[in-house]
């Protein structure tokens, strides 16, 4: 029997990267999935964002594990669309136990040079979008009366400053405060809330030239190899970037009975990056 057998998880940013990895990992352990992603380009983001084809591939991989999945294209900035997506998913799958507020963007820029749209979009997606996710989804867990778990994807950036990431850092640090209040408010309903704080992870959000330039401003056209050389100095263990499944395994611990009394914590998976 899987560690989340028979449970249903709502996952944002599920079309690729960590979100897809979480969906597949939980499906491997017996969960059914409600998946959402924006599936269109976000104007301020300098790398290609997820597509409809990406979300369809997540569906294919979950269904290949003989688990059910309800997938919807929705923007975490749109509370109405999120609410409809989760309502439809619960209507088809019958319950909700787990919420993974994973959707996020990265738009590196110097603090005093970024424009207002870059700042606002970051906060709208990476901070307010998480509040909208839990606002849309967690009432279903409360109504179920079985307890449950919420995991919010923060970042090592919430714990350790990096230049050119003020908006990202502000959003990810804000998630810690949101998590702690939610953990306090939801504990009587046996709903646990935690943040997870990855270091660099080898996904499309990291593996792109704007991020390479963030790590290697000394190189005119940095490559992945240039990025990895710099990233090795961030993590104390000899690895430039983790794999998405490394984060998914930590998420699985937090949402399963293995973590049944873990709430209100900042769960770091950083290869020693914060040491």
Regions flagged by a language model, labelled:
Residues 110-111, 115-123, 231:
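Substrate-binding pocket helix/loop in short-chain dehydrogenase/reductase
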Residues 224, 235-247:
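A conserved structural motif in NAD(P)-dependent oxidoreductases
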Residues 2-38:
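Canonical Rossmann dinucleotide-binding motif of NAD(H)/NADP(H)-dependent dehydrogenases/reductases
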Residues 134, 171, 179:
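Active-site helix of classical SDR
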Residues 160, 233, 238-239, 251-252, ...:
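Short C-terminal tail/terminal secondary-structure segment
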Residues 187, 192, 262-264:
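Short, small/polar-rich loop/turn modules that mediate ligand/substrate recognition or access, typified
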Residues 155:
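Residue(s) in the substrate-gating loop at a strand-loop-helix junction
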């Amino acid at each position: 029997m899987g560690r989340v057998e028979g449970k249903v998880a709502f996952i944002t940013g599920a079309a690729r990267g960590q979100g897809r990895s979480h969906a597949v990992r939980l499906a491997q352990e017996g969960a059914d999935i409600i998946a959402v992603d924006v599936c269109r380009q976000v104007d301020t983001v300098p790398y290609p964002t997820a597509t409809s084809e990406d979300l369809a591939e997540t569906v294919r991989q979950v269904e290949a594990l003989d688990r059910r999945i309800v997938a919807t294209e929705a923007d975490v900035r749109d509370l109405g669309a999120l609410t409809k997506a989760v309502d439809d998913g619960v209507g088809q799958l019958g319950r909700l136990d787990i919420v993974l507020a994973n959707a996020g963007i990265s738009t590196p820029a110097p603090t005093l040079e970024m424009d207002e749209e870059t700042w606002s979009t970051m906060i709208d997606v990476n901070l307010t979008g998480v509040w909208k996710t839990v606002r849309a989804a967690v009432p279903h867990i409360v109504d179920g009366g079985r307890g449950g778990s919420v995991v919010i994807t923060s970042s090592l950036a919430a714990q350790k400053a990096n230049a050119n990431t003020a908006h990202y850092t502000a959003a990810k640090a804000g998630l810690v405060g949101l998590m702690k209040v939610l953990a306090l408010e939801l504990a009587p309903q046996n709903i646990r809330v935690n943040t997870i704080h990855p270091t660099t992870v080898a996904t499309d959000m990291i593996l792109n030239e704007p991020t390479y330039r963030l790590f290697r401003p000394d190189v005119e056209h940095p490559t992945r190899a240039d990025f990895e050389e710099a990233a090795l100095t961030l993590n104390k263990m000899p690895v430039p970037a983790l794999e998405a499944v490394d984060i998914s395994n930590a998420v699985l611990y937090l949402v399963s009975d293995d973590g049944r009394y873990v709430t209100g914590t900042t769960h770091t998976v950083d290869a020693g990056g914060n040491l």
